[in-house]
């Protein structure tokens, strides 16, 4: 009888270990991807983010990281697809709105960029008010 609590604890540990290990691996891949992208090793970054997505396929942050890498490579269409995919996974993910606004600015779709920046800010993402004002000025000049 005295062993029962220890057996239960051991069983709980065995059952929870794979989930904890998977979470550790996801974060490890994400960290590798961020470091690789910061040093310009974009292909390695994409590989790391793909590995993370295999373990956690519905994570909008990881999808957004992939989009940021594509954006850094100048692959705006691929980046835009990633940001939109992230927003489908979580329509309240402010960073994806912010990143999509960067693409929209390059495409000179300033009204849409302003809307995305405002949405990102309303969701708590740190957007400088001066940047929104700049986009508003560009949008007004375009009309």
Provide a role label for each language-model segment.
Residues 24-51, 55:
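Alpha-helical segment of the N-proximal tetratricopeptide repeat
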Residues 25-27, 60-61, 94-95, 128-129:
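Helix-start (N-cap) detector for alpha-helical repeat units in TPR-like alpha-solenoids
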Residues 30, 37, 64, 70-71, ...:
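Position-specific recognition of the canonical hydrophobic site in helix A of tetratricopeptide repeat
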Residues 38-39, 72-73, 106, 137-141:
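Register position in tetratricopeptide repeats
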């Amino acid at each position: 009888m005295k062993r029962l609590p220890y057996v239960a604890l051991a069983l709980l540990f065995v059952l929870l270990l794979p989930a904890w290990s998977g979470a550790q691996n996801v974060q490890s891949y994400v960290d590798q991807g961020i470091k690789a992208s910061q040093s310009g090793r974009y292909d390695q970054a994409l590989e790391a983010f793909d590995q993370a997505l295999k373990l956690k396929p519905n994570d909008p942050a990881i999808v957004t990281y992939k989009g940021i890498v594509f954006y850094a490579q100048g692959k705006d269409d691929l980046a835009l697809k990633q940001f939109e995919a992230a927003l489908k996974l979580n329509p309240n993910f402010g960073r994806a709105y912010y990143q999509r606004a960067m693409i929209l600015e390059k495409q000179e779709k300033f009204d849409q960029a302003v809307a995305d920046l405002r949405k990102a800010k309303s969701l708590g993402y740190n957007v400088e008010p001066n940047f929104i004002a700049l986009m508003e000025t560009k949008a007004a000049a375009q009309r």
